[in-house]
Amino acid sequence: MNKVKIGVVGAGIYGNYHIHTYACDPNVEKVVFCDLNDERKKAAEEKYGVKGYSTVKEMVEAEALDAVSVATSDPYHFDPCKDAIEAGVKYLLIEKPMALTVKECEELMELAEKNNVKISVDFHKRWDPAYNCIKDDIKSEDKKIIRGYMSLDDVIAVPEQWFT
């Protein structure tokens, strides 16, 4: 398996999870990131020992990246995705939602197809056993009351033991 070079867009809450997870993955050769906020950029550089850039284009071109993860706030997904595709990245992971409008999503998909870029939108609960159980219950013929409780204390980073 070839090791990959990955760039993360955004050094906020989710961006930090992405940077940390990629930095711990033995299949990742290099991790870099970009963020417009100089304080966040400096903090992430110091915390993870990885290089930070100011723009997506600069990051992708300087590092010849294979993949980019877009982990900015929801309203700011479209432009970095477009910039990454236009800068030559071949794989793009986008935190949900892909974009704010159907038109923006369609534009990204067309641009990706034109440039042979693979896109994935991260719905991190998609594989969660509890969600699959609820989905099965909803589809079930046995109609019963389904109650749910939400917790905001779950860990997002992948345990490092998973890489062995």
Predicted features and spans:
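Short, well-ordered coil/turn segments that N-cap beta-strands
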Residues: V28, K90, V117-K118
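Hydrophobic C-terminal alpha-helix "anchor/cap" residues
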Residues: Y22-A23, M59, I138
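Predominantly a Rossmann-like dinucleotide-binding segment in NAD(P)-dependent oxidoreductases
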Residues: K125-T164
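N-terminal Rossmann-like dinucleotide-binding module
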Residues: M1-Y48
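Rossmann-fold dehydrogenase core element
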Residues: E106-H124, D142-G148
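Local beta-strand N-terminus motif with an aromatic residue
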Residues: K30, G49, L65-V68, D142-I145
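Beta-loop-alpha module in the N-terminal Rossmann-like domain of NAD(P)-dependent dehydrogenases
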Residues: H18, V50-L111
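Acidic-histidine catalytic/liganding microenvironments
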Residues: D25-P26, A62-E63, D128
